[in-house]
Amino acid sequence: MSALPPQPPPPLLLLLLALLAAPAALARRAESASASQPEAEHQPPPGPGNATQLGSGMAGGGSSNSSVDAVVTRISSLLRDLPTLKATVIVACAFSALLIACLLLRVFRLGKRLKKTRKYDIITTPAERVEMAPLNEEDDEDEDSTVFDIKYR
């Protein structure tokens, strides 16, 4: 029977969850602060130069102006959601790094266990993967206590 690896203590898990949740909470706070400000504050007030540009753009045909507006709205929506996206990427990277570290730790611990010499143990490996050679070939009269050298393939 193999023993299960020890579970990390609950305070460590709580600290890990707090560290992972902090970027998301900060992103939500920044997003709510930017959403509470009206859109009129972000746009410059119309001046003589702006009024002529808007009028000439509409008069010349609105297709180029509408494509520019579409690009601007896409970019502004990405910039508005940037803290949330950043927090999501940070959490995903942290989770991936934690998973890789756990798997590497498990592989190295398992490798150390397999390399240990086992004396007087029950062979649980299938017979085709085990080579057995008697160590005490000179004492053939005592057949009850044959010691084997076991090599695993």
Curated annotation (Swiss-Prot):
Function of the molecule: Essential for Golgi structural integrity.
One Gene Ontology biological process: Golgi organization
Protein keywords: Cell membrane, Glycoprotein, Golgi apparatus, Membrane, Signal, Transmembrane, Transmembrane helix
InterPro entries: FAM174-like
Residues in the signal sequence: 1-27
Gene that this sequence comes from: Fam174b
Transmembrane regions listed in the UniProt entry: 85-105
Gene Ontology CC terms: Golgi apparatus; plasma membrane
Disulfide bridge map: none
Stretches in topological domain Extracellular: 28-84
Cytoplasmic topological domain: 106-153
Glycosylation sites (chain numbering): 50
Family to which this protein belongs: Belongs to the FAM174 family.
Bilayer topology annotation: Single-pass type I membrane protein
The UniProt record lists the keyword Cell membrane: yes
Compartment(s) where it occurs, according to its Swiss-Prot or TrEMBL record: Cell membrane; Golgi apparatus
Record protein name field: Membrane protein FAM174B
Spans annotated as Disordered: 31-67
